[in-house]
UniProtKB/Swiss-Prot annotation:
This is Uncharacterized protein Mb0922c. Residues 67-87 are annotated as: Disordered. Pfam families: DUF2630. It comes from the Bacteria.
Length: 87
C-alpha cells in the first residue's frame, strides 16, 4: 500500500486481489522454471507482509466504524506491528 492518500475499503480489497493474483503468478513461474525458489520465497514474503497490512487496515476501519469513529483515521501500520496478527 502506497504512502500518501489513504485507500478506501474497495481500493484495499482490490489491492488484496492483485496481491493474490501476483502470488499465484509467482507459483506458476516457479513451476515453469521462470524464477528460482529463493526468488519466489523472497517475493512471497513481501506479498505476505502487504496482505497482513491490508487486512489490518480493513480491521482498523471496521473497528472505528463500529465505535463511532472515522474510518479514514485508520493507518497502514509497519510490518513488524501487524505480522502474526490473529484477530
Amino acid at each position: 500500500m502506497g504512502k500518501g492518500r489513504k485507500p478506501t475499503d474497495s481500493e484495499t480489497l482490490a489491492h488484496i486481489r492483485d496481491l493474490v493474483a501476483e502470488e499465484k503468478a509467482l507459483r506458476a513461474q516457479l513451476r515453469h522454471g521462470g524464477i528460482s525458489e529463493s526468488e519466489e520465497q523472497q517475493q512471497l514474503r513481501r506479498i505476505e507482509i502487504e496482505l497482513d497490512q491490508c487486512w489490518d487496515l480493513l480491521r482498523q476501519r471496521r473497528a472505528l466504524r463500529q465505535t463511532g469513529g472515522d474510518p479514514r483515521e485508520a493507518v497502514v501500520r509497519p510490518a513488524d506491528q501487524v505480522e502474526g496478527y490473529t484477530g
